[in-house]
Every structure is written in structure tokens, then in C-alpha cells.
Regions:
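Cytoplasmic membrane-interface "Motif A"-like loop-to-helix N-cap segments
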Residues: 71-86
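A late C-terminal transmembrane helix in Major Facilitator Superfamily
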Residues: 135-168
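Short, small-residue-biased leader/transition segments that mark boundaries at the very start
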Residues: 1-3
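A membrane-interface helix-boundary motif in multi-pass transporters
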Residues: 77-80, 162-190
Length: 208
């Protein structure tokens, strides 16, 4: 089977879609997390930036540990840790969005979110793609997943901006009040879809 035929297999595109939805949640926090903390929770600029930056630092740890998680704890099975860290991603995002204003809660949410995203980037964007295609097709498969992910990140930015802007109310004194409810549901839904989609590849890989 040629590379083109391999890339036509549903498993590659399911994985690309899963990674794309994961990137929506990832860049939602990186792009809009500071504004959310400022407007929804009353954090100062320094506080908001400091909290959101934690997830990037912990993402490095998640990336470093991702191979160890799958190889040592799960004997090379990527699906189980991808599911577990996908759920952790959604839980951390929900904690960030709905967990209240306490500093420690928001710091904890970004610690968990960063670790989860770091692991998922390696799994959905790399290791799982390598697992489902022959070695000669891995570059093409990674390219498909990467392109889908960054297209989704761009769409997220536009969609999130529209959802946020369309739910701003202006008081008589000119003060703006943000309703992050709709965009928060969009981000949560994307994170949930991202960990459900790879489950569809179980049967397909068995038949390959």
C-alpha cells in the first residue's frame, strides 16, 4: 500500500481531528487565559500572566515524561495514557474556568493543564501517528496531524474572539462586562472531543 493510500485510512484523520480539538483547548488558554483571569476573576496583569505561564513550563515536564508513561507504565500502549491525560486536560480546564478565584486553585489548574497538554502533544501529534502507519509514511502522517492542529488553532482564535466579543455588555458608565459562559463551553467541548476521538481507532488498528 502506497503512502497516499495509507494517508487515506480513517485512523490518520481521526487522530488529526483529535489533535486539532486538543489544540483548540491549548491555544484557548494561551491566547485568552490572561483576559479571562483579569475580567472574570479580577486578577491583576502580573497575576494573570504568571498563572497562565505555569502551563507552558509544566508542558515541558509532560513532554519529557510522555514516553516514560506509555513505555514503562502502559507497555507501549498509547491509547490508555492518551485517554487518561485527555480527561485530565478537560478536568484541569474545567477547574480553571469554574473553580473560583483562589490563587492556589488556578495555579493547580495550570499545573495539571500544562502536564496534560505536554503529554497529549507527544501522543496525538507524534507517537500515535507513528504507530498507525508504516515507517516510510510517518513524515506524511505527522504533516497531516500538524496541519490540522494549527488550522484548528487559527479557527479557535477567530471563534473564541467572536464568542467573547458578542457577549460583552457595556454599562452606563462605560465599563465592559464579559460573559465567558459560551466560549467556556466551546473550549470544554473541544477538550472532551479530543480524548473521545482516539477511541474510535481501537477497532481499526486491530483490523490493519
Amino acid at each position: 500500500m502506497c503512502i497516499r493510500d495509507r494517508l487515506r485510512t480513517p485512523a490518520v484523520w481521526v487522530l488529526a481531528a483529535a489533535s486539532a480539538f486538543m489544540y483548540i483547548s491549548r491555544y484557548a488558554i494561551n491566547g485568552w487565559g490572561v483576559l479571562f483571569l483579569q475580567e472574570a476573576k479580577g486578577f491583576s496583569d502580573v497575576e494573570a500572566i504568571s498563572v497562565v505561564s505555569i502551563n507552558a513550563l509544566l508542558g515541558i515536564l509532560g513532554t519529557v515524561l510522555s514516553g516514560w508513561f506509555s513505555d514503562k507504565l502502559f507497555k507501549g500502549d498509547r491509547k490508555i495514557p492518551a485517554l487518561l491525560f485527555g480527561i485530565l486536560n478537560s478536568v484541569a480546564l474545567a477547574l480553571f474556568l469554574y473553580g473560583g478565584n483562589a490563587m492556589w486553585v488556578n495555579v493547580l489548574s495550570m499545573v495539571l493543564f500544562g502536564i496534560a497538554i505536554g503529554v497529549l502533544i507527544c501522543f496525538l501529534g507524534g507517537l500515535m501517528a507513528v504507530d498507525i502507519v508504516p515507517r516510510k509514511a510517518t513524515g506524511a502522517a505527522l504533516g497531516v496531524v500538524g496541519i490540522a492542529s494549527y488550522i484548528a488553532a487559527g479557527i479557535q482564535d477567530v471563534a473564541s474572539g467572536w464568542l467573547i466579543d458578542s457577549h460583552i455588555t457595556v454599562a452606563t458608565d462605560g465599563a465592559k462586562h464579559y460573559d465567558f459562559g459560551p466560549v467556556a463551553l466551546f473550549w470544554i467541548a473541544a477538550s472532551v472531543i479530543s480524548f473521545l476521538l482516539p477511541l474510535m481507532n481501537r477497532k481499526q488498528k486491530t483490523e490493519a
